[in-house]
Regions:
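Conserved alpha-helix/loop element of class I SAM-dependent methyltransferases that forms part
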Residues: 17-36
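Class I SAM-dependent methyltransferase SAM/SAH-binding core
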Residues: 41, 47-95
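A short acidic, Gly/Pro-enriched loop at the edge of an enzyme's catalytic core
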Residues: 94-105
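A short SAM/SAH-binding and catalytic strip from SAM-dependent methyltransferases
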Residues: 105-118
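A short glycine-rich, Lys/Arg-flanked "PGG" loop and its adjoining helix->strand segment in the class I
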Residues: 119-133
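Short, glycine-/aromatic-enriched active-site segment of Class I SAM-dependent methyltransferases
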Residues: 139-158
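Short alpha-helix
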Residues: 160-175
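Conserved Class I S-adenosyl-L-methionine
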Residues: 182-240
Length: 240
């Protein structure tokens, strides 16, 4: 079944969304000063490329949150290899079991869309300390008239996707201030799609039919043809 092929393709990928170590480092600097031992949540952590780096850079109490337990097992492996401690929690991001006012830094690279941008901003705000900060990356239209193929692809998976002005307005309505905005470079997409494309070829060599791989390959093909129409933007936010 297609879902099984999806998980086989995504097993052991270094990341589950566009990004890079350089981008994570930059966004952490843009987040500003944190307590000496901050409470950090990496929500929708995937296999933990940002989680482990955040633990190394902040020296904080870092927890990776994801619903897919094999991803969390990989987080634990990566943390052990890096000689840092990272907690893991299998939980839904729309019902995080943390006390109000307990989180200094909530990190969400490529995951807020799962519950929706506006819903994420509303649900996560009460968790923050008075000086807490949210760092997230969000898929956005960079064209007011994207190609029909790109529109059809994203409408199927994320029909609520907006432009940057639309998200900036939503952030203001939700009572947040924007500390920084950063558009992820093309190299960050390559970091995600390069390993995914290689994994697809491995599955093809193992005998998985092309028609079952097509759905996994589609997002790469759409990006190659219409990448100018959309991108990922990082927002560093504080409650007003």
């Amino acid at each position: 079944m297609t879902e099984d092929v999806f998980w086989r393709a995504h097993t052991d990928l270094p990341r589950e969304a566009p990004g890079s170590e350089a981008t994570t480092r930059l966004l952490l600097r843009l987040a500003g000063p944190l307590p000496s031992r901050p409470r950090v949540l990496d929500v929708g952590s995937g296999t933990g490329p940002a989680t482990v780096l955040l633990a190394q850079l902040t020296g904080g109490d870092v927890t990776a949150v994801d619903r897919h337990e094999p991803f969390l097992a990989r987080v634990t492996e990566r943390a052990k290899a890096a000689n840092v401690h990272v907690g893991t929690l299998a939980a839904s991001m729309d019902a995080l079991p943390f006390a109000p006012g307990s989180v200094d830094l909530l990190w969400a690279e490529g995951s807020a869309y799962i519950m929706g941008f506006d819903a994420a901003l509303a649900a996560w705000r009460p968790l923050l300390t008075p000086s807490g900060v949210v760092v997230l990356t969000e898929a956005e239209w960079s064209s007011d008239a994207p190609a029909p193929e790109a529109r059809a692809f994203w409408d199927a998976g994320y029909p609520a996707m907006r432009t940057m002005p639309g998200n900036v307005a939503a952030i203001a309505r939700a009572g947040w201030s924007i500390r920084a905005v950063y558009v992820l470079p093309d190299a960050d997409w390559d970091n995600y799609y390069g390993p995914l494309a290689a994994r697809i070829e491995e599955l093809r060599a193992e005998g998985v039919p092309d028609d079952r791989l097509a759905a996994v390959r589609e997002e790469i093909d759409v990006r190659e043809r219409h990448g100018a129409d959309y991108g990922y933007t990082a927002y560093v936010l504080r409650p007003r």
